[in-house]
Amino acid sequence: MTPELMIKACSFYTGHLVKTHFCTWRDIARTNENVVLAEKMNRAVTCYNFRLQKSVFHHWHSYMEDQKEKLKNILLRIQQIIYCHKLTIILTKWRNTARHKSKKKEDELILKHELQLKKWKNRLILKRAAAEESNFPERSSSEVFLVDETLKCDISLLPERAILQIFFYLSLKDVIICGQVNHAWMLMTQLNSLWNAIDFSSVKNVIPDKYIVSTLQRWRLNVLRLNFRGCLLRPKTFRSVSHCRNLQELNVSDCPTFTDESMRHISEGCPGVLCLNLSNTTITNRTMRLLPRHFHNLQNLSLAYCRRFTDKGLQYLNLGNGCHKLIYLDLSGCTQISVQGFRYIANSCTGIMHLTINDMPTLTDNCVKALVEKCSRITSLVFTGAPHISDCTFRALSACKLRKIRFEGNKRVTDASFKFIDKNYPNLSHIYMADCKGITDSSLRSLSPLKQLTVLNLANCVRIGDMGLKQFLDGPASMRIRELNLSNCVRLSDASVMKLSERCPNLNYLSLRNCEHLTAQGIGYIVNIFSLVSIDLSGTDISNEGLNVLSRHKKLKELSVSECYRITDDGIQAFCKSSLILEHLDVSYCSQLSDMIIKALAIYCINLTSLSIAGCPKITDSAMEMLSAKCHYLHILDISGCVLLTDQILEDLQIGCKQLRILKMQYCTNISKKAAQRMSSKVQQQEYNTNDPPRWFGYDREGNPVTELDNITSSKGALELTVKKSTYSSEDQAA
């Protein structure tokens, strides 16, 4: 073999080997790409499947979560339904039990009422039988048992303090009667402390002068307070007062026989007098000269309606030691006093704190300016019946620290006066601005910052509306307000009452008389004033529904719904059932009411002290018999216009209502004059006549409704009566 062939063979072999290995390498690379691609495809398929599974699982998971939430809500709802069902069962049982107990209690009250009424009638029968037996025949065994079962109580065994407290509740006439029972009772009525204060005005028509003189002579060292108001006494009797050396208070108002000479004797013998009431007497300048000479410690002086003294008499007050300790002064009705007279008062009585000047049309701004120049301590001011007082008076009073102010029936007082009040009298607690037509909502806005205000009387201020009251209640004054009189403020509506329930937590007395826009919704807001004890809704549109809502209050003691023609017996009965503590009720001029309301009062409201059913012609003797049998604490009763009542009710009242003090029975055509005269000796004040009821009552002397033609003039008369009755608030009347 040649080298060339070897080289050629080697080259061929090498080429073949390279070709073989290259093809093999190429095939291997292709195989690797397919494997990688297959792996990638597998991974892609796996990833795709995972993402698909993840998406499906997410939807499934969301679905399952929703199902779980729905199931949870369903279970909660089922639990709530079961709980509400249990509550419903419990409340149903409680309601049935409460109704059963209420029904049982009501039945017990009715049964007790019937038993007491039966006992009352038996007592009346025995009493009348005893009155008819003039020879006092032997009693039956039952009557003897009734008498003998009475428990004996000897009050003379009580401590002296307790005995005094018992006798303090009695009038002078009752004390004298008690002293005539026996020797032990006479000794109890001779306690010295019992004769510190003697009120002869309550027995002015009973006790003659000689007994008054002997009483004063016997107790001359113990007497501290004497009241002769309205007594028609001889001058000698007044002179006996001078023996009471320790006398501190003397009231001789309305005594026509009291003269300057009587005053001279008293002033010489009683130098320690602190309070002196000379109102409506015939005193002159001579008495005025005696006051500073003898009464050096005089603090309270009333010269109301004494028109015989002059400015010169007021000048005498500065003589000697003067009346510089005078704190209270009443000059009501003294129209003879001029501006100079008020200057004399300012010079003599610089310490005056309480000033009352009523019924004085001659009072002007200059009079007040002259007075307050030196009397800067005035805190209480009363000007009623002074039409010439204007805003200038408030400007002049800016130097005084007023706490109580009262104006009434003044047309010259405007909103400007209240701007002075806001700036100068931050401590005002009582504001009476009744029947001041110039007052608007702006005035209430000025009063809102008064933090000490407790009493606000804006009766007959017809220009006041919801907006003004809202602005007032939004201020700090609403938090302490205790009494609010908005009678005849006809622009007020339910919005004002809603604001009252939100902002007045301490409101006790509220008058919304003749607020005609008040509805049942407003009555619902009144229930939310939890501190309320007295409400006047007379002349409003209240119905039985409103009374049912009002009965939920539970704490009302006084309710007035006079001239409310939509209420019936059912409404009053529903209210009485829930108002067991009711003390005052006025349903006068609600002619649709009958005996049923009196029965409800006798059953549920036995603590009643004041009742007015004037203008209710359907009330009969049987109703008053029930009232007398149950309501033994009745003090004030107005049955004027109850034309069906007879003399029988007066006998019942004398037996059952022994605490009756004021009785009004005008237009009672079936009550005789003789019976009324007998009754007058049992009460302190009585009004009686047998005239036919006025036409605006709406019925005749037999209780039959009058025709529309006869009732044309009724609205005017009723309005005048309503305006007159609604002027004063409860606290003002008490004062």
UniProtKB/Swiss-Prot annotation:
Compartment(s) where it occurs, according to its Swiss-Prot or TrEMBL record: Cytoplasm, Cytoskeleton, Flagellum axoneme; Cytoplasm, Cytoskeleton, Microtubule organizing center, Centrosome
Segments forming domain F-box: 152-198
Keyword Ubl conjugation: no
Per-repeat ranges for LRR: 230-254, 255-280, 281-305, 306-333, 334-359, 360-385, 386-406, 410-435, 436-460, 461-488, 489-514, 515-538, 539-563, 564-589, 590-615, 616-641, 642-667
Compositionally biased spans, kind Polar residues: 682-692
Region ranges (Disordered): 682-703
Cross-referenced Pfam families: F-box-like, LRR_6
SUPFAM superfamilies cross-referenced by the UniProt entry: F-box domain (SSF81383), RNI-like (SSF52047)
Protein name listed in UniProt: F-box and leucine-rich repeat protein 13
